[in-house]
Regions:
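Alpha-helical transmembrane segments and their juxtamembrane interfaces
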Residues: 13-15, 32-35, 118
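Bacterial N-terminal signal peptides
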Residues: 23-35
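Interaction/scaffold regions that mediate signaling and macromolecular assembly across diverse proteins
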Residues: 44-91, 97-102, 111-268
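Boundary at the C-terminal end of the N-terminal hydrophobic targeting segment
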Residues: 38-43
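N-terminal secretory signal peptides that target proteins for export/translocation
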Residues: 1-21
Length: 268
């Protein structure tokens, strides 16, 4: 399961203590921990609401980002990133859907924060220009009290613990060929619907960033290289794709080139 911090009761050498004292101390410990989680949750609500509203304002219909708007309102992004740092945010007693939604949101928020940190008035052209071309390996983020990199979130926390291939339509690496960002945060209650919608946006909506049909009958297809990179997560990715598309079966003739240009909205 996820590598989260857990509080433990330490038994000291030197003889048994009166059970009443031990019970009292344990009760104080548990109450304090519960109050801490409640306080963190209350802070989360306000930060999440403001951040979700900003996403709705800063994204267009293709999921491309108005980065100047995010730069102007980076305080909202910072507050949400700070909220993600709270110890216990990924507590093991939470439902799996809650933890997965939090991990997806964290990956995407940290990526946006990385871009606005280096946006440089629009001169940044690609996330691959940062950290020697390997920004995903830098453990510069704090999630649930732990320092992590984007790659650790994706591979160690998500892929190793959740059998959910649709996460590849939800994790957004700030590139033109990445899946579209949503105009909202992922939530435990709506996660299945949200992931299904992301899958439709990638596989069914005719966006040539992800799938291009060729031939007179449009049954030959070039598809996103995400299938090439993460094919094992989908099982038989060819069958996976065809089962989710209406009409005649597609023949997959190759992978599209991945476009690492920034997923920014075109300048007006």
């Amino acid at each position: 399961m996820l590598d989260v911090e857990q509080s433990t009761v330490v038994h000291h050498a030197g003889g048994a203590r009166p059970r009443l004292i031990e019970a009292g101390r344990l009760l104080v410990f548990l109450v304090a921990g519960t109050m801490g989680f409640a306080a963190a949750g209350q802070e989360t609500d306000d930060a999440s609401r403001a951040y979700g509203e900003l996403l709705a304002q800063a994204l267009d219909g293709r999921g491309l980002v108005d980065y100047p708007r995010l730069v102007d309102r980076r305080g909202v992004v910072d507050a949400y990133v700070d909220r993600l740092a709270a110890p216990g945010l990924l507590h093991e007693q939470q439902p799996e859907a809650q933890r997965l939604a939090t991990l997806i949101n964290a990956y995407n928020a940290f990526t946006l924060r990385l871009i606005i940190d280096h946006y440089d008035a629009g001169r940044l052209s690609s996330i691959t220009d940062l950290h020697g071309g390997k920004p995903w390996d830098v453990a510069e983020w704090t999630l649930s009290g732990q320092r992590v990199s984007l790659n650790q979130i994706e591979h160690e926390h998500i892929r190793e613990n959740f059998n959910e291939p649709r996460i590849h339509w939800a994790l957004v690496c700030a590139a033109w060929s990445c899946p579209p960002l949503r105009h909202e945060l992922y939530t435990a209650e709506d996660l299945d619907r949200q992931l299904a919608d992301q899958e439709r946006r990638v596989l069914l909506k005719g966006d040539r960033r992800f799938i291009q049909l060729e031939g007179d009958d449009e049954t030959a297809a070039r598809v996103t290289p995400l299938f090439e990179w993460y094919g094992q997560d989908f099982g038989n990715w060819r069958e996976y794709s065809n089962q989710r598309r209406p009409g005649p079966r597609l023949r997959f003739v190759g992978f599209l080139d991945y476009d690492w240009r920034l997923n920014a909205q075109p300048s007006p």
